[in-house]
Amino acid sequence: MKQRRRLPVVILTCAALAAPEESSAVLQSCSVSATALNFGLYDPLSGSAAQSTGTVTVVCQVSLVGLFVNWTVALSTGSSGNYVARQLQNGPNSMSYNLYTNAARTSVWGDGTSGTSVVSANPFLIVGSNTVNYTVYGSIPAAQDRPAGSYTDTLTVTMTY
């Protein structure tokens, strides 16, 4: 009698472990958005880098049962065309800056080429809306004597899953 009670549990466990991932879950969609970094007033005489943070947000919709999803999030070069030498622009004037994946600001956030990094994840997503936030760490090196004005750059955030 005890074996009959245990047998269904064993069969169900084996069936759940043997089921292919695609049949147990449906990933409906994922989207990515980002907040702007605002470095505030830059003082070229301060002797220290200006730093700021922003957020990249990934939102995935899942129906049925949960699943694991592999993804990467990359950033473009911006107007400079170069990951390790990004430039903020103000008309003909430019100012060096960069974006990083870590608080120490040692890992340039790019597309995974030319010594840059991407952020990646393989989270278990549950039914419904799932949100994952990544911090973007920005830095403008010290001692850049530039004309006053508003310096900007625009980058593209790409999520691959």
Go through each PLM region and give its residues:
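Extracellular beta-sheet repeat scaffolds used for adhesion and glycan interaction
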Residues: 104-129
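Bacterial N-terminal signal peptides that target proteins for export
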Residues: 1-10
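Predominantly extracellular/luminal cell-surface or secreted proteins
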Residues: 74-78, 98-102, 110
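A surface/secretory-pathway sequence property marking extracellular, secreted
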Residues: 85-105
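N-terminal small/polar-rich segments of proteins
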Residues: 21-91, 121-161
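Bacterial N-terminal signal peptides
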Residues: 10-18
